[in-house]
Amino acid sequence: MMGHGDIDQLITMLARLPGLGPRSARRAALALLRQPESRMLPLAHLMERAATRVKTCSLCGNLDTVDPCHICTDAGRDRGLICVVETVGDLWALERAGVHRGVYQVLGGTLSALAGLGPDDLNVRPLFERIEEGGVREVILALSATVEGATTAHWLQERLLPTGVTVTRVGHGVPMGGALDVLDDGTLAAALTARRSL
């Protein structure tokens, strides 16, 4: 790139991060390099600390510095309500929204024949173990509105049916502020199918 080994390696590593292309990576590298004391060194220290301290929660699959994670050990959480998500990023998004007061199960992906991901590749065992222990009333499937998300939701629903717990799925359809004429056919169909009375 620029003929400077260390700088090129920094840009290359930054460009591997989701959402950062080569141009954004160069800008980020420049911002870090221009202020090494106030930006780069603190960031490097935090990244090193996170790499050694952050672990995956053995109960739900969340990332935290403790295992079980803070959500799983929070006495104020409703353990009878489990929200199943694909990724830790999905869990964090729901936490930011502040609407779910139960616990979670992070699958780590979805079923995908194309990607070669089957049921054994998903983190579902802890979910079924918690259900077997008793006290779980409802499992909310908060999976993406994709073919893989729908396939995974259907597979989970079939496995959960014999347990007697209520299985629900998050609503899909028209987003807040969304105009109908700009939505794709699949979104409109999902919105009409998932309609509810007022």
Curated annotation (Swiss-Prot):
Pfam families per record? RecR_C, RecR_HhH, RecR_ZnF, Toprim_4
Q: Name one GO biological process term.
A: DNA recombination
List residues of the Toprim domain. Answer: 80-175
Q: List each coiled-coil range.
A: none
Chain positions of all zinc fingers (C4-type): 57-72
Family, according to the entry, reads as follows: Belongs to the RecR family.
Q: What does this protein do?
A: May play a role in DNA repair. It seems to be involved in an RecBC-independent recombinational process of DNA repair. It may act with RecF and RecO.
PANTHER family reported in the protein's UniProt record: RECOMBINATION PROTEIN RECR
What protein is this chain from? Recombination protein RecR
Q: Which organism is it from?
A: Gluconobacter oxydans (strain 621H) (Gluconobacter suboxydans)
From the broadest rank down, the organism's phylogenetic lineage runs: Bacteria, Pseudomonadati, Pseudomonadota, Alphaproteobacteria, Acetobacterales
Q: Which gene encodes it?
A: recR
